């Protein structure tokens, strides 16, 4: 009898391994909602998670962090994981396009906090609370537009329900 070889688990999972397979398996005749969360870019960081890693000597060190070899290495590894996350989001966007639903799909990309460095995550400094919040909705949001309005994650669920036509 044939047996499938088991793959060793990824020693440095991104948390995005199931994103595209999940999207491929969705019922194509129904609307869909996916909340995709990643491990990237959370600690502990791993080396070599992208083909061309960021070089510590090339990173920009924020003025509130010490500019030393340890900080530079930590920032480079953080940027590597952000890059891997970006690549995985790109794969999802490619799959949405391949399925022919890109023009009728609302995509939100958010982060719950700033990067996990001193004076960032868990603080009320801008570096802790100014986090990405992108929306792609071709029917309603002009590409490359920006907003200076205050946004909060508490608005996400009601907004999604309203978009879906659910009375709240």
Each model region followed by its residue ranges:
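Active-site-proximal cap/lid insertion segments
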Residues: 1-10, 22-168
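Extracytoplasmic mature domains of secreted/periplasmic and thylakoid-lumen proteins
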Residues: 15-19
């Amino acid at each position: 009898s044939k047996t499938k070889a088991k793959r060793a688990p990824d020693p440095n999972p991104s948390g995005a391994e199931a994103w595209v397979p999940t999207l491929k398996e969705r019922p194509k005749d129904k609307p869909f909602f996916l909340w995709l969360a990643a491990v990237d870019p959370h600690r502990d960081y791993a080396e070599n998670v992208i083909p061309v890693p960021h070089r510590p000597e090339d990173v920009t060190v924020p003025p509130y962090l010490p500019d030393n070899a340890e900080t530079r290495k930590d920032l480079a590894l953080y940027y590597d994981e952000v890059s891997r996350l970006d690549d995985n989001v790109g794969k999802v966007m490619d799959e949405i396009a391949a399925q022919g639903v890109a023009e009728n799909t609302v995509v939100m990309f958010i982060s719950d906090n700033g990067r996990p460095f001193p004076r960032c995550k868990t603080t009320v400094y801008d570096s802790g609370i100014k986090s990405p919040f992108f929306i792609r909705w071709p029917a309603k949001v002009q590409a490359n537009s920006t907003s200076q309005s205050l946004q909060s994650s508490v608005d996400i669920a009601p907004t999604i329900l309203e978009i879906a036509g659910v009375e709240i």
